[in-house]
Amino acid sequence: MDAIKKKMQAMKLEKDNALDRAAMCEQQAKDANLRAEKAEEEARQLQKKIQTIENELDQTQESLMQVNGKLEEKEKALQNAESEVAALNRRIQLLEEDLERSEERLATATAKLSEASQAADESERARKVLENRSLADEERMDALENQLKEARFLAEEADKKYDEVARKLAMVEADLERAEERAESGESKIVELEEELRVVGNNLKSLEVSEEKANQREEEYKNQIKTLTTRLKEAEARAEFAERSVQKLQKEVDRLEDELVAEKEKYKDIGDDLDTAFVELILKE
């Protein structure tokens, strides 16, 4: 009887211990499940961060493509501007050559005008000499009448020549005015071309500044892509570590659940043994 009681007490103690171990296993299983859920939540958050970083990387790459497109457009604009500058230089050279020819024609016209003026002066002096002689030689008027007529004829011829010279002079002056107008027009055109050249130069400077800024932005985008790539690799590494941690925790949960099942089976066996012992005790009494 004492042996049975001791056995029952031992079995009860073992049952209590089994219950404690089962409770502890259940608590450990709950803790492991909480850790697993937390790890899964962290893994989901990391996955979201990875997705966000990938989206940022895509946007950055798209921005880089846009910047490269703009750079190509600016390079084309720069080439067009250089072509325009070359064309303007050719036009300026042609205008300079035209101006030189105009100056040569102007110099020729000026020389002809000077010669015509000298001829007109000489004719005027000859006419005055003839008139002075006719007035001074009144006593010899009869004798010199024929000479006077001839002098008048010469004077008329001189007048005709003077009129012809004056007409030619007017024509030369008109040619000179046209040459001056062309020279002024050429100078105005040169000023306009110089202004266009200055504007093109400013545009080239602006394009160079824009290109430098675009290069800086491209370098910044490259650095940003490099940083995002590093962050993506780190996030992937953390995600892999979290997945491994979840797998380890899941294995730990499975192990604790197996231990819990084993403890429950053991508890059931102890319960069966106690029931058998009670039955035997009752039968002996």
UniProtKB/Swiss-Prot annotation:
InterPro entries in the record: Tropomyosin
Keyword field: Coiled coil, Repeat
Basic and acidic residues composition bias: residue spans: 122-133
Alphabetical list of Pfam families matching this protein: Tropomyosin (PF00261)
Coiled coil: 1-277
Region of interest called Disordered, as start-end residue ranges on this chain: 103-133
Assembly and oligomerization: Homodimer.
Function, as annotated: Tropomyosin, in association with the troponin complex, plays a central role in the calcium dependent regulation of muscle contraction.
Domain notes: The molecule is in a coiled coil structure that is formed by 2 polypeptide chains. The sequence exhibits a prominent seven-residues periodicity.
Family of the protein in this entry: Belongs to the tropomyosin family.
Name this protein carries in UniProt: Tropomyosin-2
Organism: Bombyx mori (Silk moth)
